[in-house]
Amino acid sequence: MALDIYPAIDLKEGKAVRLFKGDMQSATIYGEALEFAKMFEDMGAKWLHIVDLDGAFAGIPQNLKYIEEILRTTHLQIQIGGGIRNEERIRLYMDLGVSRVILGSIAIKNWEFVKTMAHSYPIAVGIDAREGKVAVQGWAKESDICSSVLAEKFAGSEVQAIICTDINRDGALSGINVSFTQDIACRSGIYTIASGGFASSNELEILDENPYISGVIIGKAFYEGKINLKEALALFENKKVKI
């Protein structure tokens, strides 16, 4: 299968921002989130990856009205993460029309809960790691759980996807950590999306040729003009048609 491309919006007070290695103090504001969502749809995107940064730090969703506006205004399928730590909040997003919910911090504390939720809801697990250790609460705290061990917890589960981010590369335009992503994919056996550090269109073919990596999240590379997203989306959509 051809690589799935997920343009990304990190939401902070309704704005599309990008962080450098997960540091909220380094946030660069690019503009209104809704305008970028519409732009991505016009470029041919089918999916949109959204992180509610305010929600990730607060522990509860903080940008609901902006997410609802994007859902109402576009036809994009949205996967959303940030501050979603119980079934009530999962249902809240499902009722809004979100296509997939990302569980991160709760996946470390209670992976059985996550597997139970995956039986009833479209769930992705976010594995965000720094030097192999999983970080939580908006990456503000580091756990003692190894990313590879956490990935193995979801092998054979109904979790739809694992989104793995190398925090030290996120927003740094230094390239996807392919070996880290491949390890997560092999240990979980689940559709795996690479995130953190995507730098240029040259990486797309490398990722596409890797049988273990199914998708990639593109954020700062687009916002900084490092990739022609419209061309990339068209290229891989055509590949899917041919398949």
From Swiss-Prot:
Pathway(s) it belongs to: Amino-acid biosynthesis; L-histidine biosynthesis; L-histidine from 5-phospho-alpha-D-ribose 1-diphosphate: step 4/9
Superkingdom of the organism of origin: Bacteria
Pfam families: His_biosynth
GO biological process assignments: L-histidine biosynthetic process; L-tryptophan biosynthetic process
Active-site feature positions: 10 (proton acceptor), 128 (proton donor)
Family designation: Belongs to the HisA/HisF family.
Protein name as it appears in the record: 1-(5-phosphoribosyl)-5-[(5-phosphoribosylamino)methylideneamino] imidazole-4-carboxamide isomerase
Organism taxonomic ancestry: Bacteria, Pseudomonadati, Campylobacterota, Epsilonproteobacteria, Campylobacterales
